[in-house]
Amino acid sequence: MRADKISNLTLARSKFLDGVVFTYLSGFGLSISLILAIGAQNAFVLKYGLRREYVLPIVLTCAISDAILIIAGIAGFGALAHALPWFETAMRYGGVLFLFWYGLQNALSAWRGGSALEGEADVTTSLRKTLLTLLAITFLNPHVYLDTVVLIGSISAQYEDRLAFGIGAALGSFTFFICLGFGSRLLSPIFANPAAWRVLDAIIALTMWVIAISLLL
């Protein structure tokens, strides 16, 4: 009898752990799939990763921002956003203006050229201004709220252990940005050529403008 109880407890524990692991991996996979495509935030991280400038603060800011949005989604903020129609509209037009402006900065940089991996010889932006720009790119993009808050929030409701799902999603985001920020330096030999930077700046500008236009459609 005692052996049967132990066996049942072991089986129940195994099923519980299997469920938690599956839920965690589901959140992990969904998070990475949502941020895998190149976007405003990813392009920003890539650019600074190539320059090897403020990489850790940028990566941590992205990961923490995503974690906050994921928690908000799981906590039901998505339903609140749906209840406030003006919220999405305000974020959309604010995001459009900012993305057009940031795209213009990169377009001008691509036009002027002269950027390369020249270390301390380059003029750098302060850490504070860099992080404020990153936060604006992150939180002024309505797609972030639709994907991270609403989508992840609604999908997490399908799982019994929403905490495991949220942890998986947050760690998925952290893993992606760590790999993008620190892995991009492997491309440094290519971007030692100023022409490569002009191409990257042009691609980033086009990416920002495409996202901005898509918000208006």
Model segments located where?
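Internal alpha-helical transmembrane segments of multi-pass membrane proteins, especially GPCRs
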Residues: 29, 56-60, 92, 132, ...
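Juxtamembrane transmembrane-helix termini in multi-pass membrane transport proteins
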Residues: 15-89, 149-164
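Alpha-helical multi-pass membrane helix bundles of inner-membrane/thylakoid proteins
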Residues: 2, 6-16, 88-90, 101-142, ...
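Juxtamembrane boundary at the C-terminal end of a transmembrane helix
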Residues: 213-217
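Interfacial loop-to-transmembrane junctions
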Residues: 182-206
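Membrane-embedded alpha-helical segments of transport systems
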Residues: 60-72, 140, 145, 171-177
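Membrane helix-loop-helix hairpins that form the core translocation module of multi-pass transporters
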Residues: 55-125, 129-130, 183-186, 206
